[in-house]
Amino acid sequence: NPVDGVEITYKLASGGSATLAITHPNGDVIREISVPGGSGVHRVNWDLRHSTGSGSETWAAWDNPELARPIGNRGAWVTPGVYTATVSANGSSNSTHFTVRGDPEMPQITQDMYDARERFMLEAQALTAEIQAYMRENGMGGGGGRGFGRGGGPPIDTPQGKLTAAMRAVGGAYSSLNGGQVRGGTLYPPTTTHRQQFHLAKSLFDEVRGGMDR
């Protein structure tokens, strides 16, 4: 299978820890990944995605003959632009620049559309993390995943029920764009329905916070 994303090759004179940092065109570092730090030549890849926001990352080669790429939880696709990959090890750093392009088979998607999609995905991810943190702080669970699950839950007229519904709403919007498991996502920007799901989640969250903070 071809490499997932862009391949990065580096050589280290001596062993130690090493980190790969990816810098967005806007100057923000969007991924920091622990990579092999032994002496010699190494080749790793970045999957052209943002972090999942779930903690530290360690790179590992993907060699499943039945699957072209991982099917677990993954961050949102980045928007087209010029990115910087920096490998830091043994007190020194080396950077290289590369261009991420839009899908050539979808020329109808403009840069503004890619940018709108990226903004929405990051806002959805941030809202989910905020709701999860609030639930944990107030003894309502909130750990694990993005609330993408379906099924039963606490009554909707309770704070926990409203937050669970909020997680499902924003999680549904995120996953329908990003895909998951073996289901592909889409590069198109969010629809009116996606934005309505996001605003519903935010309204429910604001309602719970307002009631509990009084």
Tell what function each PLM region has.
Residues 52-56, 88-96:
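Short acidic/polar inter-strand loop motif in beta-rich domains
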Residues 97, 102-145:
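Charged, amphipathic alpha-helical linkers/stalks
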Residues 1-19, 23, 43-45, 110-129:
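Contiguous beta-strand segments within globular domains
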Residues 1, 13, 37-39, 76-80:
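Surface-exposed coil/turn segments at beta-strand junctions on protein surfaces, enriched
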